[in-house]
């Protein structure tokens, strides 16, 4: 038997079972749990390599031929290290007709046993050795303000947005709402020319009939926002329509507590599922205790990224940002007080810990309205780094193995937002049958800058050099548009998400859309238990005087490797026996200046 050192093997084929790799310049490591390729039969493209005619490439099978369950792929990514909520493992990825068709071993079944997908005459190959592959990310809090957010999103690893808006109107600068048929149609028509998956939220304030007609127009969900009025009646009616049409409802609650307090908002929901935006509250919501919504099973809590992670600069940047985003006047004392009420260091500090406990399930941006669309992925991993640095390993993790923490955090911007908006059967993970929206990363750039972004099997954005060079690696090497962003390729490699009733009513033909429209589904049958790796419901209370966020002792158990008793000694204990969730602000972040000086 031929033997090879792990170092030599990883140099040739990428790391394998039992090996670990560091994620960017963070303190996080992932350990390969399994390898679905076959030692000695690895698929490798290139001169003198295995994927040649008569060897690893089959020369006789046509595109629609099958041998057992194995069929010829359009694209095979070889020896990929998959980082997904489903696991951290190595495999070949087969893509066909824009979808993930196989995960396992590629090759020529006429020569090799155990082949799951065929490399044939019709197959292109992408060399995945030494790279990490994640599902395209989702951002479910996008203000539809300008089209240039799309390449920024793609360059940050985001391939799907749930958005709302009308362009640079003041309503959209504050709220993610495409109100009424005209604006839903306009948004879908604009998305037809952009290389990203998109769905749009309509206004969730009003009586049932005008809300319903927006869903018929194709809105994939509803948004309740305090700037339009987040009253108990609005919440009840929006959820009533959503229950009838199977769409999601997102909410930005009442900061000023004008129509009631957090308990009144919770009561108006009547146990019906709702996606709570920026649950900490700096982005908006009942001051100071909207964070308490993490304890309810019917609320799917999310964060927006300006408060993530908590750093020494977080508080300082928020006041002016908030004044601009919500059309406030710094000369009006009441407006200044409104802004001040939303920025609380205590709840911002607690937010990171609640993410690490799995109590906040989703990450998003709030792009151009107190958030950055290109930093959803980056800030998620900065927060994971911060939590490991300050609190140690997550339960079940060990040296060079942060797999549990990594799965928790990757789920926050992939599968969980997809579940929340009824699109998890299409996107959100690397699983057979889903759209082939995949992001490749060099490990040293993981979480900061992708190597390429694939949309439904076609590269949309990629690191590429001077177009006039003799080889593709000559400087300047930057992210550039690829063929997936042009012509009919653009409309055939992205989709738009709409309501089922809108699709059935023929909006594709009426609006003259070229992209495939896919209906959202199962939006009303989910709850927090549906959130992968992030379903904790701690009994959190926010002190209205000190703004301290505290949980019970049992909420600290089964979180970290360090015993709950040891952690409890480090946390402040309240008069009623709870433990305050607090952490120091980060003074130096990974995935930051080292990657973005130029």
Curated annotation (Swiss-Prot):
Ni(2+) 2 binds at residues 223, 252, 278. Belongs to the metallo-dependent hydrolases superfamily. Urease alpha subunit family. GO terms for molecular function: nickel cation binding; urease activity. It comes from the Bacteria. Its EC number is 3.5.1.5. Residues 136-598 form the Urease domain. The keyword Hydrolase applies. NCBIfam families: PRK13207.1, urease_alph. InterPro entries: Amidohydro-rel (IPR006680), Metal-dep_hydrolase_composite (IPR011059), Metal_Hydrolase (IPR032466), Urease_alpha_N_dom (IPR011612), Urease_alpha_subunit (IPR050112), Urease_AS (IPR017950), Urease_asu (IPR005848), Urease_asu_c (IPR017951). Substrate binds at residue 225. Keywords: Cytoplasm, Hydrolase, Metal-binding, Nickel. The gene is ureC. PROSITE patterns: UREASE_1, UREASE_2, UREASE_3. The keyword Lyase does not apply. It catalyses: urea + 2 H2O + H(+) = hydrogencarbonate + 2 NH4(+). SUPFAM superfamilies: Composite domain of metallo-dependent hydrolases, Metallo-dependent hydrolases. Signal peptide: none annotated. One of its GO terms (cellular component) is cytoplasm. This is Urease subunit alpha.
